[in-house]
Amino acid sequence: MKLKSAFSQLMFKYVTVLGLALTLGTAYAQAEKETPAKGVMWEVKSEKNTAYLFGSFHLAKASFYPMPEAVEQAYKQADTLVVEVDTTDAKAAEKTMPLFTYAAPDKLENHISKKTWENLQAMVGSSVVQFQSLKPTIAATALTLSLFRQQGYDASKGVDLHYLLRAKQDKKDIVELESLAFQASMLGSLNDEDADAMLAQTLDGLKNGDILRETADMIEAWKNGDAENLAKILLHAANKDAGSKKLMKILLDDRNPGMTEKIVDMLNKEKKLFIVVGAGHFSGPNSILDMLEKQGLQVRQIK
């Protein structure tokens, strides 16, 4: 049986059950060239080893493939695929879901501001009842996934999942930099103030088109192999306001040191590594690349 992303399947279940049919921001849906992606990849050298780091998008389209020959060769020569998490682990995904939901009689409305609840009601209408069991972070994710599914993006076509499935088929070793439990705990355990801010920001970004526009711009830069522009777009999105800065700190900056430490440890061994991590982790002053360079490793982009 063909493996799929267990976590994305669970998320798809929520999106489907909620019956979401968002049309917000679709006016921006720019004409996208249906061509294979170049992506962004870096070579990292230590005294003992060389690894290749490839920036991923967790949502993608079939038209993104095949990847460039340089990326394919980096994958093929690797003994080990390194990813953020193994999203095909159905048991791990099932175990994480309680961290994202409220047990009755508790509900979402009790944990977010009146304004955020009213904005959610205005956006999803009668489907808002189905949100009551979800924590704000999963509600925000479901809303965003719904919008991008309408634009043709699919978690089952995501770059990390693409290589995970191939690595399993090719019998390569697979190493996680994090775990689903860690990621779920990180998002599911946000205090009410931060979780409310995340959901409120998502609702605003969906309504005004910023989420679609900024993500589409980042994907276009990634497809063109333009790491510099990708970093600029992400930096702009991250510094729009205090809420954006806080969110990016939680999602990227706070996680990068731990992932960097594990990458450095693996580079001190002799395994050939192909590392696939969300492209956002390779951008900015607190990026994984920046931290690797500060530890004396040689980093260069493969163009």
Question: What name fits each language-model region?
Answer:
Residues 40-250:
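Structured, acidic catalytic/metal-binding patches in enzyme active sites
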Residues 27-31:
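Boundary at the C-terminal end of the N-terminal hydrophobic targeting segment
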